[in-house]
From Swiss-Prot:
Cross-referenced InterPro entries: GTP-CH-I_C/QueF, GTP-CH-I_N, GTP_CycHdrlase_I, GTP_CycHdrlase_I_CS, GTP_CycHdrlase_I_dom
A single MF term (Gene Ontology): GTP cyclohydrolase I activity
Subunit structure: Toroid-shaped homodecamer, composed of two pentamers of five dimers.
Gene expressing this chain: folE
SUPFAM superfamilies: Tetrahydrobiopterin biosynthesis enzymes-like (SSF55620)
Name recorded for this polypeptide: GTP cyclohydrolase 1
GO CC terms in record: cytoplasm
Keywords linked to the UniProt accession: GTP-binding, Hydrolase, Metal-binding, Nucleotide-binding, One-carbon metabolism, Zinc
Length: 196
């Protein structure tokens, strides 16, 4: 699984200095009252926003339960927030994550699916990769026989710059195993994701 892990730890001092330089580059005075603490605040915000770079997302799936369950597990409407790696502006929306456990019947806690999505979203990211990384982690760590992940998100890089289309929603999906190979199963899980 390609996790795009960080090559070094977050350097808050360097990030603060870089934000100060950015303010100067756009024509602002970083020493005016309203901006005095902005570089440090932005650096702290980025430290949190990109925290997933410094974590192995598959660790959240290490705790499993042998339930003998061989049917669909689906968590819908998981809020996600990430940063577009092309423009470093947010994209946000919801993830729907479903899987059918492998023959072992091994399942993970429902909150772990949300944690996985959150951890992978907390890095410079593209929606397509995020969707695939979530699906691949479930196959890798749970040995799931079928996985479906759908993300619906609004990208501020499309809303506030360039084409300027606020409200446009991008939908991506990643299917693995039985959902990829069986059209009826895939149609069923997508119907459940849509809430029908």
């Amino acid at each position: 699984m390609d996790n795009h892990a960080a090559v070094r730890e977050f350097d808050e001092e360097r990030a603060t200095a870089a934000i100060r330089e950015l303010l100067i580059a756009v024509g602002e005075d970083p020493d005016r009252e309203g901006l005095l603490e902005t570089p440090a605040r932005v650096a702290r915000a980025y430290k949190e926003t990109f925290a997933g770079l410094h974590e192995d997302p598959t660790t959240v799936l290490e705790k499993t339960f042998s339930e003998g369950h061989e049917e669909l597990v689906l968590v819908r409407e998981i809020p996600i927030y990430s940063m577009c790696e092309h423009h470093l502006v947010p994209f946000f929306g919801v993830a729907h994550i479903g899987y059918i456990p492998g023959k072992s019947g091994k399942v993970t806690g429902l909150s772990k699916l949300a944690r996985l999505a959150d951890m992978l979203a907390k890095r410079p990211q593209v929606q397509e990769r995020l969707t695939s990384q979530i699906a691949d982690a479930l196959v890798e760590k749970l040995d799931a026989q079928a996985v479906a992940v759908v993300i619906e998100a609004e990208h501020l890089c499309m809303a506030m710059r360039g084409i300027r289309k606020p409200g446009a929603v991008t939908t991506t999906s990643a299917v693995r195993g039985g959902f990829k190979n069986n059209a009826a199963s895939r149609a069923e899980v997508f119907s459940l994701i849509r809430g029908h």
